[in-house]
């Protein structure tokens, strides 16, 4: 949401102690200075750790075990709706109406819900699960779905699975709901893929691997995805198995990845065939779980989970360079940032 000289953002949080958060927070960015101001919280919700918005409203979930009450939640003004999630520790969701998909990290399955014409969740349509594991005995003894993405130009759902070192591509028909696994992209053993972003043509994909702290480029060839190359996120630094968020600039020239253990944002030039590392910038906090590029591409905001702050960076759209403004906003355990729609 934009007012004169200000842009507003929703902040997803963890609410379990010692966090002081109670749900979804909101802040305002001064687009002249980069100053951040805490606004009134939006809703009280336990562990709303990921958010997304559409023209219909705001969507989140409670990240917890299904026996504790994991649920999908929808908010539009004073209206709200919720549905139980048949999965453990949901961590990501995506929407392509009339479908909404949730990645359940703990149980490894993906829950697909139907939305009505006004965006309200109606019920569960499909439950997707592919068994698998990886060599990391602490993190990969079973599947861990970490992200879901509906492709814009095809009827396909992409699932990134950290536990099985794979990216799964499902073909689907919305009416009636029918999902079929069309490709499993096997990534290097122990890489632990977390999130993926696509270029606008959906011909190239960039996968951030949490466990190996690498960036893997996928290219589409004759309707199949192939690994093109792999690059370390940070040069000359010890791998600490904690890479997190990834964002591609609108002009598809620059790519940003957060490295939580090293407290850095890694910047890549992806204008060519091979990503080129340009910089690694300190996040001005501790454990950068998420970050977002503003719609005008002039700002980058970072959610530092362990230092309980959101920090603003000024961004040069031509060079991709980000520069800390010196402003931050205190929020307990911030883990997701989404720009509020107009």
Protein language model regions, located:
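A short beta-strand motif characteristic of beta-propeller blades
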Residues: 37-43, 79-84, 126, 133-138, ...
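Loop-centered beta-sheet repeat module
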Residues: 154-213
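Short loop/turn segments immediately following beta-strands, especially the blade-tip
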Residues: 27-34, 113-122, 171-177, 218-225, ...
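Short glycine/acidic-enriched loop and turn motifs that connect beta-strands
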Residues: 15-19, 64-68, 106-109, 164-166, ...
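Beta-rich, blade/repeat-based domains predominating
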Residues: 45-56, 86-99, 131-154, 187-202, ...
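Blade-loop segments of beta-propeller domains
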Residues: 37-97
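Structural preference for solvent-exposed beta-strand-turn elements
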Residues: 8-10, 15, 83-85, 92-95, ...
């Amino acid at each position: 949401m934009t007012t004169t000289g200000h842009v507003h953002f929703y902040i997803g949080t963890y609410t379990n102690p010692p966090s002081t958060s109670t749900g979804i927070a909101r802040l305002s960015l001064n687009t002249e200075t980069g100053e951040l101001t805490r606004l009134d919280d939006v809703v009280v919700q336990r562990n709303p750790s990921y958010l997304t918005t559409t023209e219909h409203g705001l969507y989140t979930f409670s990240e917890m075990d299904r026996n504790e009450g994991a649920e999908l939640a929808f908010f539009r003004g004073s209206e709200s709706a919720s549905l139980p999630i048949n999965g453990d520790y949901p961590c990501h969701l995506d929407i392509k109406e009339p479908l909404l998909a949730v990645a359940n990290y703990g149980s490894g399955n993906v829950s697909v819900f139907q939305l009505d014409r006004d965006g309200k969740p109606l019920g569960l349509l499909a439950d997707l699960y592919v068994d698998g594991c990886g060599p990391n005995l602490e993190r990969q003894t079973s599947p861990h779905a970490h992200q879901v993405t509906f492709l814009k130009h095809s009827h396909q759902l992409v699932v990134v699975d950290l536990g099985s070192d794979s990216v799964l591509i499902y073909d689907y028909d919305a009416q009636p709901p029918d999902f079929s696994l069309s490709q499993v992209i096997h990534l290097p053993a122990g890489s632990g893929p977390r999130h993926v972003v696509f270029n606008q043509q959906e011909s190239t994909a960039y996968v951030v691997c949490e466990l190996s702290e690498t960036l893997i480029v996928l290219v589409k060839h004759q309707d199949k995805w192939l690994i093109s190359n792999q690059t370390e996120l940070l040069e000359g630094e010890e791998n600490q198995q904690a890479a997190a968020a990834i964002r591609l600039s609108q002009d598809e020239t620059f790519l940003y990845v957060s490295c939580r253990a090293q407290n850095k944002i890694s910047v890549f030039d992806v204008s060519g065939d091979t990503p080129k590392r340009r910089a690694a910038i300190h996040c001005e906090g501790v454990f950068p779980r998420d970050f977002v590029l503003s719609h005008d591409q002039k700002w980058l905001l970072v959610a530092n989970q362990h230092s309980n702050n959101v920090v603003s960076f000024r961004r040069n759209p031509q060079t991709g360079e980000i520069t800390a403004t010196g402003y931050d906003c205190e929020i307990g355990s911030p883990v997701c940032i989404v720009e509020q729609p107009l």
